[in-house]
């Protein structure tokens, strides 16, 4: 028997088909990008970067109350349902140590490693759970874009941003004295080289073009800056470095997490986690449509210590 593929999380707001009339009402500019797909349903051309950007703007406004959202040209335009799923799966992880209740409110702090120009995880996490976020990045242009989004939506008290000054580090040197986080999030660079990233982008274009054999494939990549799409050594090197650096913050973070796109990277990641001395490890499968991924989570606190962490936070609320 073939196992069922993971579907969207039950709390994900993006179940079923998109409600285009509601989206267009929230953001009328979407109307000029709306087309009828081969099944006779309203859609957009997902190979058109501007259409995807306007579509995201409409989704964020209609579903999350985010009034202002934009990103610079050639920066990654995230698929929002998949990003939301990561937030919900991470919320369930916190709930497991909290008598099954998802902790909500500004007492919960999350760190988004690689917040990007789109600032998507802090926006979704704060909207759904009222968590406070710190977003880090090595790219000053991305941080400036994220800051503009935060300020335009009056979220300065909920979302703060910080540059990782040393491009060779991920966590090291980033956190300030005494900072504690319930959760870290990370969507690491997927590819190991620019050429690999370009080939991956071309595959995406070809997949999108299957419905329209007349589509001309562009020469440039699918969207995303170099540091968003690839790093030396790829996903496996980035995540294993993140694990190594997490050890120095073992007492100050309840759960570290990262997405892992390539299942073939899991054995190396699990070996790094064993070496790190993590006391709890979770690998949770996720999936949206044809895309399969998983969240890897690790903690240096045992069961009793994690429950005590939540109890302490509640007592300080």
Swiss-Prot record:
UniProt keywords, alphabetically: Cytoplasm, Methyltransferase, rRNA processing, S-adenosyl-L-methionine, Transferase
Catalytic activity: adenosine(1618) in 23S rRNA + S-adenosyl-L-methionine = N(6)-methyladenosine(1618) in 23S rRNA + S-adenosyl-L-homocysteine + H(+)
Protein transport is among the record's keywords: no
Compartments (UniProt record): Cytoplasm
Gene Ontology terms: cellular component: cytoplasm
Major location category of this protein: cytoplasm
Origin: domain of life: Bacteria
Enzyme kind, highest EC tier: transferase
GO biological process, one term: rRNA base methylation
Pfam entry (one): Methyltransf_10
Presence of the UniProt keyword Cytoplasm in the record: yes
GO MF annotation: an example: 23S rRNA (adenine(1618)-N(6))-methyltransferase activity
E.C. numbers: 2.1.1.181
Stated role: Specifically methylates the adenine in position 1618 of 23S rRNA.
Family statement drawn from the similarity comment of this UniProt entry: Belongs to the methyltransferase superfamily. METTL16/RlmF family.
NCBIfam families: PRK11727.1
Protein name: Ribosomal RNA large subunit methyltransferase F
Species this chain originates from: Pseudomonas putida (strain ATCC 700007 / DSM 6899 / JCM 31910 / BCRC 17059 / LMG 24140 / F1)
Organism phylogeny: Bacteria, Pseudomonadati, Pseudomonadota, Gammaproteobacteria, Pseudomonadales
Gene that encodes it: rlmF
């Amino acid at each position: 028997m073939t196992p069922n593929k993971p579907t969207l999380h039950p709390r994900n707001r993006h179940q079923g088909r998109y409600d285009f009339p509601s989206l267009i009402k929230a953001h009328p500019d979407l109307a000029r990008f709306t087309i009828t797909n081969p099944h006779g349903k309203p859609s957009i051309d997902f190979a058109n970067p501007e259409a995807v950007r306007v579509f995201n703007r409409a989704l964020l406004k209609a579903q999350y109350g985010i009034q202002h959202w934009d990103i610079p040209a050639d920066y990654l335009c995230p698929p929002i349902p998949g990003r939301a799923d990561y937030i919900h799966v991470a919320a369930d992880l916190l709930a497991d140590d909290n008598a099954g209740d998802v902790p909500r409110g500004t007492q919960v702090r999350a760190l988004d490693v690689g917040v990007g120009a789109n600032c998507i995880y802090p926006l979704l996490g704060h909207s759904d759970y009222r968590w406070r976020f710190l977003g880090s990045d090595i790219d000053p242009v991305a941080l400036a874009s994220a800051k503009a989004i935060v300020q335009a939506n009056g979220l300065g008290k909920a979302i703060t941003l910080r540059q990782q000054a040393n491009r060779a580090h991920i966590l090291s040197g980033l956190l300030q004295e005494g900072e504690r986080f319930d959760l870290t999030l990370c969507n690491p660079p997927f590819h190991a080289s620019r050429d690999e990233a370009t080939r991956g982008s071309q595959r995406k274009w070809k997949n999108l073009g299957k419905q329209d054999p007349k589509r001309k494939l562009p020469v440039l990549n699918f969207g995303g800056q170099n540091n968003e799409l690839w790093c030396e050594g790829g996903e496996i090197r980035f995540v294993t470095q993140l694990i190594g650096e997490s050890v120095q913050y073992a007492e100050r973070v309840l759960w570290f997490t990262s997405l892992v796109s390539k299942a073939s990277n899991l054995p190396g990641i699990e070996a790094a986690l064993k070496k790190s001395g993590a006391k709890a490890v979770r690998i949770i499968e996720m999936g949206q449509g044809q895309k399969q991924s998983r969240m890897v989570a690790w903690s240096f606190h045992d069961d009793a210590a994690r429950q005590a962490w939540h109890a302490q936070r509640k007592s300080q609320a």
